[in-house]
């Protein structure tokens, strides 16, 4: 467990460092864009003054308005670029979080209690069905089978429960057959669902 924690801390530090670098880069670009906008405004003022002397105030104001419009366009493009960069950063953060979860799981792959907990969480999604068959890879089969009574208590009272070993399945594989289809409780599938949930949460936050 100590080794797992050290690895998790290391990956977490990498993620935090990566996020901080992105934040610094975005802040620098915002400052650069602000300076560029101010420069354009100053140029517009200067050109407006010179044009006012040579061509008259009306023409000068037109030139001034055009340059101000350019400055505003740069500001809008800057804002959009910052939003895009933050969105990319959020996706990278999600990838790092999922990679961390997978790394920790791989180092705990012999932890049968952790796998049992994962399976039980998925069983909660199908506990109202009246016929359930659980298929597990050979490594974890005995662990799941020994907990059959405990699993049965999670289910609908009259539910028929079967637990089977899938000899061809890779380690960490588990799927549940129900009258309404299959539910995949495998580790990789759960990690992908975690990723989808994190991305959905980020998108919802951005929409707000």
UniProtKB/Swiss-Prot annotation:
Highest taxon in the source lineage: Bacteria
GO BP annotations, alphabetical order: bacterial-type flagellum assembly; bacterial-type flagellum-dependent swarming motility; protein transport
Segments passing through the bilayer: none
Keywords of this entry: Bacterial flagellum biogenesis, Bacterial flagellum protein export, Protein transport, Transport
One annotated Gene Ontology cellular component of this protein: cytosol
Record's keyword annotation contains DNA-binding: no
Xref: InterPro entries: Flagellar_FliH/T3SS_HrpE, FliH_Bacilli, T3SS_Stator/FliH
Protein transport in keyword set: yes
PANTHER family: FLAGELLAR ASSEMBLY PROTEIN FLIH (PTHR34982:SF1), YOP PROTEINS TRANSLOCATION PROTEIN L (PTHR34982)
Family: Belongs to the FliH family.
NCBIfam families referenced in this protein's UniProt entry, alphabetically: FliH_bacil
Function: Needed for flagellar regrowth and assembly.
Name of this protein: Probable flagellar assembly protein FliH
Upper taxonomic lineage: Bacteria, Bacillati, Bacillota, Bacilli, Bacillales
Designated gene of the protein: fliH
């Amino acid at each position: 467990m100590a080794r797992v924690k050290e690895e998790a801390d290391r990956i977490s530090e990498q993620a935090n460092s990566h996020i901080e670098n992105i934040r610094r880069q975005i802040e620098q670009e915002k400052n650069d864009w602000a300076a560029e906008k101010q420069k354009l405004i100053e140029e517009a003022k200067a050109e407006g003054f010179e044009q006012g002397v040579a061509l008259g105030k009306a023409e000068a104001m037109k030139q001034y308005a055009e340059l101000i419009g350019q400055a505003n366009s740069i500001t809008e493009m800057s804002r959009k670029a910052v939003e895009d960069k933050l969105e990319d950063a959020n996706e990278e953060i999600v990838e790092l979080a999922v990679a961390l979860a997978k790394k920790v799981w791989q180092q705990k792959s012999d932890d049968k209690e952790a796998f049992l907990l994962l399976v039980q969480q998925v069983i909660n999604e199908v506990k109202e069905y009246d016929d359930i068959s659980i298929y597990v890879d050979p490594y974890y089969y005995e662990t799941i089978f020994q907990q059959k009574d405990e699993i049965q208590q999670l289910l609908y009272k009259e539910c028929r429960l079967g637990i089977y070993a899938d000899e061809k399945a890779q380690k960490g594989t588990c799927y549940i057959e129900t009258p309404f289809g299959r539910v995949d409780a495998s580790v990789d599938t759960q990690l992908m669902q975690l990723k989808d949930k994190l991305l959905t949460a980020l998108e919802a936050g951005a929409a707000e």
